[in-house]
């Protein structure tokens, strides 16, 4: 709306959309940040896989809406997903803080969350997605797999088939949604699992041991870990939450010429069993509280406080008693200085640890210049952020 100079602003309601995930076991894998948003929301819209998490949300949210009601039997899931995303944006359009809660990681095999964030941003509505624990994260932990040990590839079962994706047999392979191959609706069952098995047999022998994996759905349950020869995989009864892990047939050799060209010619050997050698820069975390650490912890779990501090941080920095260096680090968002202040417990101690001052007494003379720089009263200039040591003190 347009009016006089004092009212020449957009008065249309502007809501906000935040998407969070519950992880796989629900309540136990909710992050503190996600809990803070759920409790702060005007309305929480959810699609969940267990009644415990649903009950927890009803107990902690001001208002709730179950988006699973938009599913219709016999109708392609994509139609329900579109309706879910539109419902989330509809709430935000009305000026509300709406939190969408999805099972697992909200951005992994969850189309409505991505569509809602994209649509909201296109309309000028603030929208963001927070990370959460996914089924693959649980698989790595449950099977003891490090995706950084060699390489790891991740395919969706139906997509792998219809696009004829070729796996690298010298890398870990994770195949999602093996229990619902080629199923577009809400029906469950093994579907076309046999077709997936036959496709994989083009690349792996029938005797190759694979693992059918299902993450535990609650803290009182155990995961399903069922090793089986690939040729016998079709005899298993799978579920919507089933994931398949296929280990590499063999490790890939190093390209020694490339390794040598990037100065890694001698770094390709397997690690030895030698005892760890103490490093001279390490020292334990100092005892005692951190004012800056306590403030940032509070901001991590209280969205309302975070909004207020972002709008005008100075009153809050004064209220919690930050020293000049702590306040400066927070205001300029210099993560190296923030980390040092939290670790050392104060700004002057952080300045000494980072090599910006010889003593804490010297650091206490620092002040913030009118141009926003942290300066000392002595003649010796402070090192620039690019030259301050980042090694632990």
Predicted regions and their residues:
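Beta-strand/loop-alpha-helix module characteristic of Rossmann-like adenine-cofactor folds
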Residues: 2-20, 37, 43, 93, ...
């Amino acid at each position: 709306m347009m009016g006089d100079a004092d009212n020449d602003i957009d008065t249309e309601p502007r809501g906000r959309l935040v998407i969070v995930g519950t992880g796989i076991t629900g309540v136990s894998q909710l992050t503190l940040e996600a809990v803070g948003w759920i409790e702060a929301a005007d309305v929480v819209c959810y699609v969940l896989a267990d009644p415990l998490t649903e009950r927890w949300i009803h107990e902690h949210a001001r208002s709730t809406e179950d988006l699973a009601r938009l599913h219709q039997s016999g109708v392609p899931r994509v139609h329900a997903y579109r309706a879910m995303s539109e419902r989330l944006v509809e709430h935000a359009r009305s000026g509300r803080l709406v939190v969408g809660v999805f099972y697992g990681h909200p951005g992994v095999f969850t189309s409505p969350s991505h569509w809602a964030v994209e649509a909201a941003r296109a309309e000028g509505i603030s929208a963001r997605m927070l990370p959460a624990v996914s089924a693959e994260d649980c698989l790595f932990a449950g099977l003891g797999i490090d995706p950084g040990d060699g390489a790891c590839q991740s395919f969706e079962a139906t997509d792998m088939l219809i696009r004829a994706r070729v796996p690298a047999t010298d890398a870990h392979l994770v195949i999602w949604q093996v229990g619902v191959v080629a199923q577009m609706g809400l029906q469950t069952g093994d579907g076309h699992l046999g077709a997936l098995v036959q496709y994989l047999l083009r690349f792996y022998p029938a005797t190759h041991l694979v693992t059918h994996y299902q993450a535990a759905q609650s803290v009182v349950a155990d995961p399903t870990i069922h090793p089986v020869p690939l040729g016998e995989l079709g005899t298993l009864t799978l579920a919507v939450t089933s994931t398949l892990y296929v280990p590499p047939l063999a490790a890939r050799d190093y390209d020694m010429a490339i390794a040598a060209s990037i100065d890694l010619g001698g770094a390709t050997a397997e690690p030895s069993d030698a005892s760890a050698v103490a490093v001279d820069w390490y020292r334990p975390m100092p005892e005692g509280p951190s004012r800056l650490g306590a403030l940032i912890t509070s901001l991590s779990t209280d969205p309302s406080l975070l909004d207020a501090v972002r709008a005008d941080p100075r009153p809050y920095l004064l209220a919690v008693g930050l020293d000049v260096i702590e306040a400066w680090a927070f205001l300029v968002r210099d993560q190296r200085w923030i980390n040092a202040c939290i670790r050392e417990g104060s700004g002057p101690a952080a300045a000494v640890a980072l090599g910006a001052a010889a003593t804490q007494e010297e650091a206490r003379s620092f002040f913030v210049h009118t141009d926003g720089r942290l300066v000392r009263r002595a003649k010796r200039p402070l090192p620039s952020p690019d030259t301050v040591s980042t090694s632990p003190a």
